[in-house]
């Protein structure tokens, strides 16, 4: 069975990252956060696995610089 990507909306990304909406949009504009996908005329969502991988990468990089 194929692993299907789960799409999450901005409020869930905010909960997962702890960042506010403006900061998330800033990171997106700087290509520092995975880009959202268009799911409608005025709606976007994020691929949950991409956000989770990004969070893990941030954690790993943070711990590398502490040591």
Feature-to-residue mapping (PLM):
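C-terminal secondary-structure termini that scaffold catalytic or DNA-interacting sites
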Residues: 60-67
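Extended, folded domain segments that form the structural surfaces/walls around functional sites
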Residues: 47-49, 65
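Polyanion-binding surface elements
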Residues: 1-23, 50-60
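Major-groove DNA-recognition helix of helix-turn-helix-type DNA-binding domains
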Residues: 17-45
């Amino acid at each position: 069975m194929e692993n299907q990507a789960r799409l999450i909306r901005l409020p869930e990304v905010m909960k997962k990252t702890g960042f506010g909406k403006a900061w998330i949009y800033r990171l997106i504009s700087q290509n520092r956060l995975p880009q959202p996908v268009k799911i409608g005329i005025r709606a976007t969502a994020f691929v949950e696995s991409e956000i989770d991988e990004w969070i893990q990468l941030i954690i790993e990089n943070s711990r590398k610089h502490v040591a």
